[in-house]
Amino acid sequence: MKPYQRQFIEFALNKQVLKFGEFTLKSGRKSPYFFNAGLFNTGRDLALLGRFYAEALVDSGIEFDLLFGPAYKGIPIATTTAVALAEHHDKDLPYCFNRKEAKDHGEGGSLVGSALQGRVMLVDDVITAGTAIRESMEIIQAHRATLAGVLISLDRQERGRGEISAIQEVERDYGCKVISIITLKDLIAYLEEKLDMAEHLAAVRAYREEFGV
């Protein structure tokens, strides 16, 4: 685990974005941890979040021309990541996002920001069922751009309804790499360092045994 990944876990714990306990997911599964990126909700939170996303992007080595944030949660993520890339990595790249409803006046169209072209890096909070990615792919393909990759904050590394995860489905269907700031494996490595979190470690390991990929 890299220093920025450990820092991100601690940031998420401090903001109660990441919690350990017992939680029922939309799928009906009982999970020993929960991640709610919507709780990164202040100016400082967003500034820090962008730095973590930018760090993961640079670390990945994936080449891309533009950041795309799917409405709605991807919008602030794309914005703050673009700022962090410019300020901390000297990479001044364009970004854009989609509207849920196309306007028929003013700017018009369903996109805001830069023209959607070239190699697109899609940024979002998490991938649960992959629906937002599929909707975004329709937009990207309609503009004759290509998907360079997808970056999310957390990869839960668990099976969907079949034998593979929603992330693995996206990688298979679109031939792109999905990267994340942290994975379930990183969470477990972090818990292994914390003696006072032994009960959570056992629960997360058991969950991975049952649902992991």
Curated annotation (Swiss-Prot):
Pathway assigned in UniProt: Pyrimidine metabolism; UMP biosynthesis via de novo pathway; UMP from orotate: step 1/2
Where do the annotations place orotate binding?
34-35, 128, 156
The record's GO molecular-function terms, alphabetically, read:
magnesium ion binding; orotate phosphoribosyltransferase activity
Binding site residues for 5-phospho-alpha-D-ribose 1-diphosphate: 26, 72-73, 99-100, 103, 105, 124-132
Q: Which Pfam families is this protein grouped with?
A: Pribosyltran (PF00156)
Any one cellular component term from GO for this entry? cytoplasm
Q: Which InterPro entries match?
A: OPRT, Or_phspho_trans_dom, PRibTrfase_dom, PRTase-like
Q: Which reaction does it catalyse?
A: orotidine 5'-phosphate + diphosphate = orotate + 5-phospho-alpha-D-ribose 1-diphosphate
* Enzyme class (EC, first level): transferase
GO biological process terms, alphabetically, are:
'de novo' pyrimidine nucleobase biosynthetic process; 'de novo' UMP biosynthetic process; pyrimidine ribonucleoside biosynthetic process
- Reported EC number(s) for this entry are 2.4.2.10
| Free-text function comment from the UniProt entry | Catalyzes the transfer of a ribosyl phosphate group from 5-phosphoribose 1-diphosphate to orotate, leading to the formation of orotidine monophosphate (OMP).
- List the PANTHER family: OROTATE PHOSPHORIBOSYLTRANSFERASE 1-RELATED
Similarity comment = Belongs to the purine/pyrimidine phosphoribosyltransferase family. PyrE subfamily.
Name listed for the protein in its UniProt record = Orotate phosphoribosyltransferase
> What is the scientific name of the source organism?
Salmonella paratyphi A (strain AKU_12601)
Q: Gene behind this chain?
A: pyrE
